[in-house]
């Protein structure tokens, strides 16, 4: 490589540094304090459990049910009686940005195998929200799901507005393109299908993060669709938008709620920092049920090989590694739920040896098509892992007892 080439690389690195430094400097100057929220929920109310004014179901939190069963076992008491009812098929879809193309492929491949069940419960986090949404409504929406993620570019979802975002303190990108997509796809037919499924006792749950309280919010989408509210469709669109709104990057979504007769304002965003996969049901999980986990991405982050990451990359990698660890921990919790309820656990994740760009926000249609194909093949072939990632005996790494090791060749 000649001197001119080195010079170009030097200029490129300086330009890249300035590109990072200028927004950070602006953030320090004007973006450190966000806009005030008009009439937020008072702090004493945020720590108390809220109940719906019109109860929609006997909701069950999987974590609470698991702990109750394990607590009885630890105390030597008899386990709670097994709930009556037929086994359920529960679908849990994780977040993962562009990796949703993989889960879309897995669902469509599963349909092609003829073994895909009708989901009694579907849950979604982050980009898993729209995937779980369409999966819940059935194979009728497979083509829409595939087309949505196969040809997606980032500008179809978000567009940069860094200066305006930093001045207002709301976000570096606008989510207006995603709003238009949701307006197009969540129409009257979808609302009717949602209400019909809910009337059959099936449930769709989407998670968001309450930005002001840093707590998880779970939304019963079918209950909203069947509520008769004139703004029901708009609420559902806003919930999906909030689920996909990356905190700090995209503005949080505002909701006006009424608590004890008083109107307050909340801000909601992507819940991926609070949970990666979860289970909620409209009753206890009967024995023989199946919990199907679709991971929008790999089980472990890509490794940094052959180079030492810089400061910014190290910070990003640390956050990414934390989210991956949260995902793996959440799958262990779901596995424990299956153990205490005598249910089946199955997981499909993008293989760790898949070669692609590491950023989940870099949308490349060619890469999306490759991920979709891998997912399709795994879904069609029934490539379900029976245990959470990293928990099989062969995957367990013992503590280090020095600096000399032996590795498989």
Spans of features found by a protein language model:
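Intrinsically disordered low-complexity regions specifically enriched for long asparagine
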Residues: 5-8, 27, 36
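Patatin-like phospholipase
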Residues: 32-120, 136-409
């Amino acid at each position: 490589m000649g001197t001119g080439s080195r010079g170009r690389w030097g200029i490129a690195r300086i330009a890249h540094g300035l590109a990072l430094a200028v927004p950070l400097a602006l953030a320090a100057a004007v973006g450190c304090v966000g806009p005030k929220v008009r009439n937020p929920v008072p702090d004493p109310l945020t720590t108390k459990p809220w109940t719906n004014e019109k109860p929609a179901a006997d909701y069950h939190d999987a974590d609470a049910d698991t702990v109750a069963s394990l607590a009885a076992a630890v105390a030597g008491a008899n386990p709670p009686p097994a709930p009556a009812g037929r086994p359920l098929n529960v679908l849990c879809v994780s977040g993962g940005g562009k990796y949703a193309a993989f889960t879309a492929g897995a669902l469509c491949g599963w349909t092609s195998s003829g073994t895909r069940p009708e989901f009694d419960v579907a849950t979604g986090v982050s980009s898993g929200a729209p995937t779980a949404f369409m999966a819940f409504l059935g194979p009728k929406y497979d083509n829409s799901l595939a087309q949505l993620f196969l040809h997606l570019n980032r500008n179809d979802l978000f567009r940069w507005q860094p200066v305006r975002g930093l001045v207002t303190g709301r976000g570096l990108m606008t989510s207006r393109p995603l709003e238009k997509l949701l307006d197009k796809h969540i129409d009257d037919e979808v609302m009717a299908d949602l209400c019909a499924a809910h009337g059959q006792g099936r449930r769709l749950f989407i998670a968001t993060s309450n930005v002001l309280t840093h707590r998880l919010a779970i939304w019963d989408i079918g209950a909203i669709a069947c509520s008769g509210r004139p703004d029901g469709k708009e609420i559902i669109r806003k919930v999906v938008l909030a689920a996909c709104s990356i905190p700090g990057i995209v503005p949080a979504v505002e909701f006006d709620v009424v608590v004890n007769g008083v109107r307050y304002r909340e801000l909601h965003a992507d819940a991926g920092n609070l949970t990666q996969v979860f289970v909620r049901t409209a009753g206890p999980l009967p024995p023989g049920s199946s919990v199907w986990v679709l991971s929008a991405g790999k089980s472990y982050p890509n490794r940094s090989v052959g180079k030492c990451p810089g400061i910014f990359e190290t910070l990003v990698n640390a956050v990414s590694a934390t989210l991956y660890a949260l995902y793996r921990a959440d799958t262990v919790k779901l596995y424990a739920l299956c153990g205490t309820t005598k249910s089946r656990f199955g997981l499909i994740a993008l293989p760790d040896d898949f070669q692609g760009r590491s950023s989940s926000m870099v949308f490349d249609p060619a890469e999306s098509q490759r991920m979709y194909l891998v997912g399709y093949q795994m879904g069609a072939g029934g490539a379900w892992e029976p245990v959470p990632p990293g928990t099989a005996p062969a995957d367990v790494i013992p503590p280090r007892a020095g600096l000399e090791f032996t590795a498989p060749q």
